[in-house]
Amino acid sequence: MADDRKAALDAALKKIEKNYGKGSIMKLGEKIDQQISTIPSGSLALDVALGIGGYPRGRIIEVYGPESSGKTTVALHAIAEVQKNGGTAAFIDAEHALDPQYAQKLGVNIDELLLSQPDTGEQGLEIADALVSSGAVDIVVIDSVAALVPRAEIDGEMGDSHVGLQARLMSQALRKLSGSINKTKTIAIFINQIREKVGVMFGNPEITPGGRALKFYATIRLEVRRAEQLKQGTDIVGNRTKIKVVKNKVAPPFKIAEVDVMYGLGISQEGELLDMAVEKDIVDKSGAWYSYKEDRIGQGRENAKIYMSNHPEMMAEVSTLVRAAYGIGEPVDVPQEAQEELPLDE
């Protein structure tokens, strides 16, 4: 009886593989490589908070938060990292608000960046689907979900009711996109805004537009919020920003990365590296002085940041030590043709 069941199962597996291709079904123990391929986020503190050293390939990421909190900055840093490693990036600018000069200062190669400014939500998501399905794009950023306006709303009159249209659009698009994103190992970053529910007396009244589908399909959800202003004398030069990993299917969630987002420059890698090195006693802080290997590198945090910026060899050395101390190592980037398809989480 057991032999008959095994023979029937073998026959069914062969038929499935014949119809849908080799690898369409297998035993989980047969997986050759379960290691998740990643790309750096552009922030060492965020790489640590993510738990795997960067963004996982073949997954959907949602980045949300209040206005001017640094959401697009976080996404542009990811694009810059992909391009540094020879990858191709696309930006679906539904808000029609991308600043090319700012993107360039963050390290984005704007000459090679694929940019689309769609007229409707359907057009934007269809373009994203075409790019992902090609298998030739490493990262697609959609900015933002709230700006993906359904065609019916564009064609309608002001004041017309369009209840649930955007939620249905997102649900339908993500059902289609999720499979091809996983198959082609493309990273899809959806930037989202926040709204407030009317009449909520208890609990958090904040919600993200676009319905619930994105919350379910996203492997990682990042909440970006400004914590405080950074001043140089009386001038405000940036914001201290908290990035909270609200959801994470590939590592423990709820970790927080604190970064300095400097106006016109993006995330200060010197600042976050200095803070993390001090936390792990790699850089010594005594009073206002910072020291590395008995050498003083600056009095005050800003001077220490300037010193590190002027000494890239030392920065690279400290970065390696910090990564080792946090146990994340360098980001893993498995060649696309050598990767096994990883199953999407339920």
From Swiss-Prot:
Cited InterPro entries: AAA+_ATPase (IPR003593), DNA_recomb/repair_RecA (IPR013765), DNA_recomb/repair_RecA_CS (IPR020584), P-loop_NTPase (IPR027417), RecA-like_C (IPR049261), RecA-like_N (IPR049428), RecA_ATP-bd (IPR020588), RecA_C_sf (IPR023400)
Its annotated compartments are: Cytoplasm
Q: Which of this chain's residues are annotated to bind ATP? A: 65-72
Q: Which CDD domains match?
A: RecA
Q: Which PROSITE patterns match?
A: RECA_1, RECA_2, RECA_3
Would you tell me the Gene Ontology cellular component terms?
cytosol
Q: Which UniProt keywords apply?
A: ATP-binding, Cytoplasm, DNA damage, DNA recombination, DNA repair, DNA-binding, Nucleotide-binding, SOS response
Task performed by this protein: Can catalyze the hydrolysis of ATP in the presence of single-stranded DNA, the ATP-dependent uptake of single-stranded DNA by duplex DNA, and the ATP-dependent hybridization of homologous single-stranded DNAs. It interacts with LexA causing its activation and leading to its autocatalytic cleavage.
Family note: Belongs to the RecA family.
Q: Report what the protein is called.
A: Protein RecA
Upper taxonomic lineage: Bacteria, Bacillati, Bacillota, Bacilli, Lactobacillales
Which gene holds the coding sequence for this protein? recA
